[in-house]
Amino acid sequence: MGAATSALNRRQLDQFEKIRLRPNGKKKYQIKHLIWAGKEMERFGLHERLLETEEGCKRIIEVLYPLEPTGSEGLKSLFNLVCVLYCLHKEQKVKDTEEAVATVRQHCHLVEKEKSATETSSGQKKNDKGIAAPPGCSQNFPAQQQGNAWVHVPLSPRTLNAWVKAVEEKKFGAEIVPMFQALSEGCTPYDINQMLNVLGDHQGALQIVKEIINEEAAQWDVTHPLPAGPLPAGQLRDPRGSDIAGTTSSVQEQLEWIYTANPRVDVGAIYRRWIILGLQKCVKMYNPVSVLDIRQGPKEPFKDYVDRFYKAIRAEQASGEVKQWMTESLLIQNANPDCKVILKGLGMHPTLEEMLTACQGVGGPSYKAKVMAEMMQTMQNQNMVQQGGPKRQRPPLRCYNCGKFGHMQRQCPEPRKTKCLKCGKLGHLAKDCRGQVNFLGYGRWMGAKPRNFPAATLGAEPSAPPPPSGTTPYDPAKKLLQQYAEKGKQLREQKRNPPAMNPDWTEGYSLNSLFGEDQ
């Protein structure tokens, strides 16, 4: 877009920067949005100079409007931006994107066109120009006859949107090849190239498809050489490999080769086969798992295993006979042991319906419980064989209170008896038993012998002189006790007979000495 702002002049650019992205929002449009829109136009095969005029923006809106309801976030953003530019070129004052989209719907009559397109696809067989479609063909047929000439009708945006959405979701899975076959039925090389050009995120896969196209085109040139000498006047030339690929041929030449040439050369069908070969190679590259590696897990349901198996079979590039042999041999061979036992019991060449019905309960809760019960029974039988038979039976219960069999002490109806566990006598407990205790406190129930203490030496004499005869030995505690007794006796006597008060002391401390005769 040149300086990236050539789509708008200075006055329009000032108005553009005042329009809000959302109603009552803070963010507004900037120049970087125009630069982004110019780059996004190339993904849809549109020139960026269409943004510079009102008519160009209208054409962009007509292309993007059918894709907008189911398109990606980038496509919706581009559609909203083009609506804002259309209002600026139309000199319609808008405040935000939502108001601009509503204005475009009103001025371009998009709602009415959508209703008429729905009615036409449901029952009508004529387009807006009054051109009748060929018998047995819908309005999306890529070529329509007008008089004696064939007119090319481009692919519907809905078809392109369905193709792009399928590639984005499946990532060149096994479903892409039949999807391409359905959407490209009856298309010209120009239409097929348009379907490939709208894929922008898978250039590695498209490069593989281009290599296959170049190889097939070179092989076509070898097997179909040019005739010697110049062509007669008015005769259509034979298509070359590059003509079939749509690089050196026009749309009108492709229509003439398909419909009016003698002999006819269906360049669209030939180019379609080349694309399918390339897509099959891409599918094999994006799905490296071979059908030989598909095995049923120990807990996987048989239905899920069959789905994975046939998906891998679908991605295999082999003939129908080879796929049939792989299905008959590998489907049962790669099943888990439980399903394999059931499938082998069905006989030779069972149908898929019979196999699914027979293995329907394998892997479910009831089947797992049944298998677990059988395993536990088997393990129990093995343990009994290893242990050498059942264990010896225990003797009958005996009461410790009454000595009878058949019940325990806590269930005994007779009164509880107190019995010593040391001597075996009744009437006392073991802690009170003295019949088994000697003079040292050692009984039979103790775990060790009493310790030995050194005995006092007989005949040892004290070193101090003996006290005089007739006197008691000196005891300091006894003497101290006598002193305390005497002191207590004195205190009791003083309390009983307090001393008399001294008159001199009373006079010396009376108030008369302070005030004298004033009292």
Curated annotation (Swiss-Prot):
Gene Ontology molecular function: RNA binding; structural molecule activity; zinc ion binding
Record carries keyword Transmembrane: no
Keywords, ordered alphabetically: Capsid protein, Host cytoplasm, Host nucleus, Host-virus interaction, Lipoprotein, Metal-binding, Myristate, Phosphoprotein, Repeat, RNA-binding, Viral budding, Viral budding via the host ESCRT complexes, Viral nucleoprotein, Viral release from host cell, Virion, Zinc, Zinc-finger
Stretch list, region Disordered: 113-138, 454-519
Site (Cleavage): 438-439
Motif Nuclear localization signal: where in chain: 26-32
Family annotation (InterPro entries): Gag_p24_C, Lentvrl_matrix_N, Matrix_HIV/RSV_N, Primate_lentivir_Gag_pol-like, Retrov_capsid_C, Retrov_capsid_N, Retrovr_matrix, Znf_CCHC
GO biological process, one term: viral budding via host ESCRT complex
Pfam families reported in the protein's UniProt record: Gag_p17 (PF00540), Gag_p24 (PF00607), Gag_p24_C (PF19317), zf-CCHC (PF00098)
PTM comment text: Capsid protein p24 is phosphorylated.
PROSITE patterns recorded: ZF_CCHC
Zinc finger CCHC-type: from-to: 397-414, 418-435
Composition skew (Basic and acidic residues), residue ranges: 486-496
SMART domains noted in UniProt: ZnF_C2HC
A GO term from the CC aspect: host cell cytoplasm
Motif annotated as Nuclear export signal, chain positions: 16-22
Motif (PTAP/PSAP motif): 462-465
Lipid attachment locations (N-myristoyl glycine): 2
Protein function: Matrix protein p17 targets Gag and Gag-Pol polyproteins to the plasma membrane via a multipartite membrane binding signal, that includes its myristoylated N-terminus. Also mediates nuclear localization of the preintegration complex. Implicated in the release from host cell mediated by Vpu.
Other noteworthy facts: This is an African green monkey isolate.
Sequence similarity: Belongs to the primate lentivirus group gag polyprotein family.
Comment, domains: Late-budding domains (L domains) are short sequence motifs essential for viral particle budding. They recruit proteins of the host ESCRT machinery (Endosomal Sorting Complex Required for Transport) or ESCRT-associated proteins. p6-gag contains one L domain: a PTAP/PSAP motif, which interacts with the UEV domain of TSG101.
The protein, known as: Gag polyprotein
Species assigned in the record: Simian immunodeficiency virus agm.vervet (isolate AGM TYO-1) (SIV-agm.ver)
